[in-house]
Structure formats: C-alpha cells, structure tokens
C-alpha cells in the first residue's frame, strides 16, 4: 500500500483564501479588517522565521498586522504591560506572543495575561477549558489544524482508535480533546508509557509530536493507518524531517503528512482563522 499524501500546503492556502474573501467582504461592507499583534522577544532564529511566516499570512489575507520586536533584555513587567495595552486596543482582535520566551520571563504568566477573547493561539486556560467541556471557541492552532486536514480529506474519524505520541500543552493534550470531539477512542502516550510499540501498532490514527527525528519506525505502523507527523527536526546536513520514518511509514499507511509541508502550514492557517473568528464573534459582531 502506498499512502496518499495529506498536502498541508494546499489546504492551508485554501483556508487563507477563504479568510481573505471574508475579510474583503467585511471591508466592502464598511467594517474594519481584523487586527493581529505579533510579539517577539529576543532574536531566536527559529522564532524569527515563524513570526515572519505569520506576518506574511496576515498581509496575504488583508489583516492589519502589528509587529512588536522587543530586545532580549525586556523584563517580564514590560512584556505584561504591553499585553495590557493590546488587550485594551479595540483594533486588535488577536495577540500572539511567540514562544519560547527568554529566561526570566514566566511563559504561563504571560499567556494567561492575554485576554481569552484575543488568545488566538488557544493556549489560555479559559479556551483550553472550553475545549475540554465540548464547547470550544478559540482552539489551539496545531490540533485544530490537524482536524481541518482530516475533514478536508473526508476522513471519517468516528470510532477510530487514535494514539497521540507526546503530551505537551501545545499539541498532545489539546489534540486528545479534539480527537474525543471527533469521535475517536483516544490514547495519549508519554515518557512513562510502557510498550510504546504496542500502542502504535494498534493505532488507526497516529499523531506524533515529540520533536525527535525518526522516533517512530515505519514497521510499527498498522497497515492502513492514518499518520500525522507534527515533528519538525533539522538534521546536521540541513534536511528537515519529522518524528516518523517517512518512507517506511508511507509504505504501510493509507494517509500520511509529509515534513515539511504537512501540519506546519496548517498551524499558521488556523491562527489566521482564529483571528477572524475573534473579530466576528467577540469584537465586531455586526460583521457576521
């Protein structure tokens, strides 16, 4: 069996085009364009690349994009004060603080300072709690982007045995909640899991997010499984690979996401969707 490739770049482009059309309709009706504030502290090269892609996507769909590039020496108090200012700004619908933050700044305190109705990353306890209670509003971007991929490929998830490898707050934990909403019987594995291979071999839907190249051998993949690889790892030779041994897995799976070009583009596309949603549902309801 040769797996069908789940093309995240194409689906992400479709999502952005749909958002752009809605923004154009808003502006044509005399309503304001959604606004996104992107905050970067320090000069982490990977963070700079991620932030640039988010700002580019904002421009592409017609959002108002505000950039705040703060020095590495920025204090926690200064960052919190900026967030307070953005929370009170009626032209800003979403606030994104790029992680990781420099040492000395408490990630949790910063993320919890963002108003829940402007938390377009979906990390605030309010938004995670709503997802857990089956009443989601602004949803964590990567898990929601994965669900969008499955939906766009008309993959029926109801009744599937889903296994999530990795239990991070950003992907693994909210992903498990999304999969429950999608009708899956869901298992989350982590560093204390015994016999990881057993869990992988029984997964109809496998989602891997650990950040270790080639962590899951292809021979573990169940015949016909759907494989979603969230990992983005740069090898010493410069090649970008995922957490799953792609060629081996693709020979056994029915669907698989490539790295790059699979999940990554969907994270940014979902951020854009969330910003439009925040604008319409929370801040500018006449634009519905």
Swiss-Prot record:
Which residues of the sequence carry a binding annotation for NADP(+)? Answer: 166-168, 232
Q: Which residues form the signal peptide?
A: none
Q: Which GO terms describe its cellular component?
A: cytosol
| Gene3D superfamilies named in the record | Leucine Dehydrogenase, chain A, domain 1 (3.40.50.10860), NAD(P)-binding Rossmann-like Domain (3.40.50.720)
Which EC number applies?
A: 1.5.1.5, 3.5.4.9
Per the UniProt entry, what is one GO biological process? Answer: tetrahydrofolate interconversion
Where does this protein act, in terms of pathway?
One-carbon metabolism; tetrahydrofolate interconversion
Any one GO MF annotation of this record: methenyltetrahydrofolate cyclohydrolase activity
Q: Which CDD domains match?
A: NAD_bind_m-THF_DH_Cyclohyd
Question: What are the entry keywords?
Answer: Amino-acid biosynthesis, Histidine biosynthesis, Hydrolase, Methionine biosynthesis, Multifunctional enzyme, NADP, One-carbon metabolism, Oxidoreductase, Purine biosynthesis
What the entry lists under Pfam families is as follows: THF_DHG_CYH, THF_DHG_CYH_C
Q: Which reaction does it catalyse?
A: (6R)-5,10-methylene-5,6,7,8-tetrahydrofolate + NADP(+) = (6R)-5,10-methenyltetrahydrofolate + NADPH; (6R)-5,10-methenyltetrahydrofolate + H2O = (6R)-10-formyltetrahydrofolate + H(+)
Family statement drawn from the similarity comment of this UniProt entry: Belongs to the tetrahydrofolate dehydrogenase/cyclohydrolase family.
PANTHER family attached here? C-1-TETRAHYDROFOLATE SYNTHASE, CYTOPLASMIC, C-1-TETRAHYDROFOLATE SYNTHASE, CYTOPLASMIC-RELATED
Summary of the function given for this chain in its UniProt record: Catalyzes the oxidation of 5,10-methylenetetrahydrofolate to 5,10-methenyltetrahydrofolate and then the hydrolysis of 5,10-methenyltetrahydrofolate to 10-formyltetrahydrofolate.
Which NCBIfam families does the UniProt record give? PRK10792.1, PRK14186.1
Q: How does it assemble?
A: Homodimer.
Q: What is this protein called?
A: Bifunctional protein FolD
- Name its species: Salmonella enteritidis PT4 (strain P125109)
Gene field: folD
């Amino acid at each position: 069996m040769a797996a069908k490739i789940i093309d995240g770049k194409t689906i992400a482009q479709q999502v952005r085009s749909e958002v752009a059309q809605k923004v154009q309709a808003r502006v044509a009706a005399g309503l304001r364009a959604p606004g996104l504030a992107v905050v970067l502290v320090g000069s982490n090269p990977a963070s700079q690349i991620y932030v640039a892609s988010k700002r580019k996507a904002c421009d592409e769909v017609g959002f108002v994009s505000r950039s705040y590039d703060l020095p590495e020496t920025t204090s926690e108090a200064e960052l919190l004060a900026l967030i307070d200012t953005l929370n009170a700004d009626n032209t800003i619908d979403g606030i994104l603080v790029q992680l990781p933050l420099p040492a000395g700044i408490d990630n949790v305190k910063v993320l919890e300072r963002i108003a829940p109705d402007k938390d377009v990353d979906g990390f605030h306890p309010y938004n995670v709690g709503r997802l857990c209670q089956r009443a989601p509003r602004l949803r964590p971007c990567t898990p929601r982007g994965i669900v969008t991929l499955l939906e766009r490929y008309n993959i029926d998830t109801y009744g599937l045995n889903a296994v999530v490898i990795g239990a991070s707050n950003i992907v693994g934990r909210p992903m498990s909640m999304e999969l429950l909403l999608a009708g899956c019987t869901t298992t989350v594995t982590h560093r204390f899991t015994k016999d990881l291979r057993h869990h992988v071999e029984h997964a109809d839907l496998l989602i891997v997010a650990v950040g270790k190249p080639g962590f899951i051998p292809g021979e573990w993949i169940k015949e016909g499984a759907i494989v979603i690889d969230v990992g983005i790892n740069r090898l010493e030779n410069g090649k970008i690979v995922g957490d799953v041994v792609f060629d081996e897995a693709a020979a056994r799976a029915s669907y698989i996401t490539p790295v790059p070009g699979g999940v990554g583009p969907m994270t940014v596309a979902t951020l854009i969707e969330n910003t439009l949603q925040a604008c319409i549902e929370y801040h500018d309801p006449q634009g519905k």
